[in-house]
Amino acid sequence: MKRLFLLALLAGCSVADTPYPIAWDPIPAPAAADCRQFEGTYADRGELFGQTTRPSLTRELFGADSPWEKASSVRLEFAAEDSVEVTVAGEGLKPETRRFSIKAGEARCDRGRLTLVAKRWVASDIMSGRESVKIELNQSDPFLVTHVYEAITGVMFLVVPLSGESARWYRFTRLKP
């Protein structure tokens, strides 16, 4: 009983929500009701307001186990009516494509706003568990502005249950349409 109480006491939960940066231009209303406006190529490294580190769009979309460190660009394309294709490219990196299915709920276009959803297992020296990521994409030329919601539930050191959520705003420069 003491061990169960200790485990419950050590279990953790964290929530972090970063508001939209006031210094950035406001996100305009979508110009069209469809999401073809997002088709194009974007820089993989972006901006997180107030931070010197440059976030990776590839890492947010594909996870920490993806080749995000070598990525230089991300291409969004509506190759079919029922999916969004995301292709990652970089020097010395074989292009990697992932298809987000609209029918499976991995992608959604709602009045000109595109949302991509990914669920993946994560494992590291410290933690293992299930991660859910929802990325809302907004066009604010010359940037792709993303609102990334992450939720993870798992165990730390294979013993301590942990759950956390975060929401952050990033922006990535459009390279070419």
Model-derived features with residue positions:
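Contiguous, well-ordered beta-strand patches that form the walls/edges
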Residues: 70-139, 171-176
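Sec-dependent bacterial lipoprotein signal peptides
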Residues: 1-13
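Short, intrinsically disordered, charge-biased short linear motifs at domain edges
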Residues: 2, 28-29, 95-97
